[in-house]
Amino acid sequence: MIKLDFLTWKNNHSSNPHVVFNGDNMDVLKKLHAMYDKQVSCIYIDPPYNNGEKYTYYSDALSHENWLKQMKTVLTELKEFLKEDGSIWISIDDGEMHYLKVLCDSVFGRKSFVATVIWQQRNTRENRKAFSNNHEYILVYSPDPELFKKRRNLLPVTEDVLARYQNPDNDPRGPWQSVTVNVQAGHAVASQFYEIVAPNGKVHTPPNGRCWIYNQDRMEQEIAKGNIWFGSDGNGVPRAKKFLKDRAPGVVPETLWLSSFVGTNKDAKTHLQALKIYNKDIFDTPKPETLIGQIIEISTNENELVMDAFLGSGTTISAAHKLNRKYIGIESEPQTCEYVMQRMEQVVAGETGGISKKVNWAGGGEVQFVI
C-alpha cells in the first residue's frame, strides 16, 4: 500500500489510477475533473438510502428534500466523468427508488435510462413485516444507451443454459436445443397455414390462433436439411433445432439478478468477516463481490476505469482490482479507509474470497491511498 498526498499522487500516479481518496466526495470529485472528465467507463455508487436507520458508520436519516438535494449535487458532478458509451449504476431500495428515478431522468435525461435491475438481496423470509422485502434496485443510465448497448459485454453462458443442449439424434453438427416453429397469427399470411407430414406419417397443423414461422417451401427446405425435429418417434410436433455452435458466445444480461448467481448481503458479510479486519463493527448492508463483479464485467473491459464515490467497505475496488480494471474510490470516513486499506492489502496478497476463484485471482498490483 502506498500513502500519498494529493499533489504527489497527481504528479506521479494519476495516469494509471488504482487509488482510494479519503475525503468528502464532492471535494475530491471537483479536484479530479481536469484529469478524468469523460474518461470513466463505469460508475457504481451505493449511496445512503435515506431509510431512517442509524448504521455503524453513519446515520441514514436526512429529510427527503435534503437527501434529494444531496443526491442531485453528487449525480450532477459524476455525470461529467462518464464516457459517451459509459454507464452509471446506482443501488437503492423501495423507500426512495421512484424519486431517485425521476431525479436521474432530470440529471442524465430520460433518454439516457438503460434499465432497472432487480437484485434479490436476501433469500430468507422476513416475518416481522407485512411483506418480506427480499430485493433492491440498481438504476442504470448511460450518456448514449445505443453506444452502451454496442460496447456492453454479454454474460458467460451458464451451466444450466449449456445443459439445455443435447444431441439425441447424434447430429454431426453437435448439441442442439429445440424451439417452437409456430408463432402468433396476428400478422400471418396465407402461405403460413398448411399441413406438415411428419416422417412417420402424422399430419400436423398449427394450433388455433397460430401459424408456422416459415412458408411451406422454406419449411420443406429446413426439413430436408435436418433442421426440424419430430421427436424420437418421428411423429412429434415439429420443432426447430438450434445448435450450440451457432449461438452467441454469451447471454444478454437480464434485469432480474437472483441471489444464486450474484449473492446476498449475508454473503457479503460472511466474506468481510473472513478477512478478520472488521471485528464486530461489520458493515450493515455490504454488497457482495459477485454482484459488483457482474456490473463491472458487463460495463467495462480490462484496463478501463471504474469509479465509486461512496466506497464503504471497498467491494467495488476489490472486484475491479481482481478484474484488472483501473479504479478510483472515494470514502469520507478515515476509519473506513483504514479498513479498506487492510482489505486491499489482502487482495494484493491473493485473498481467496468473493470472485477470486471465478477469475483465478492470485494476487498482485498496488493500491495508492491519498489522504
Please name every model-derived segment.
Residues H64-L68, M97, T285-K358:
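Conserved S-adenosyl-L-methionine
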Residues K10-K31, E345-I371:
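S-adenosyl-L-methionine
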Residues G236-A240, G312, N360-Q368:
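A glycine-rich phosphate-binding loop feature that marks nucleotide/adenosyl-phosphate handling sites
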Residues M1-L305, C337:
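Class I S-adenosyl-L-methionine
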Residues E136-I138, F193, N324-Y327, E366:
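Extracellular structured ligand-interaction cores
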Residues F21, E84, F310-G312, G363:
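Short glycine/serine/threonine-biased micro-segments
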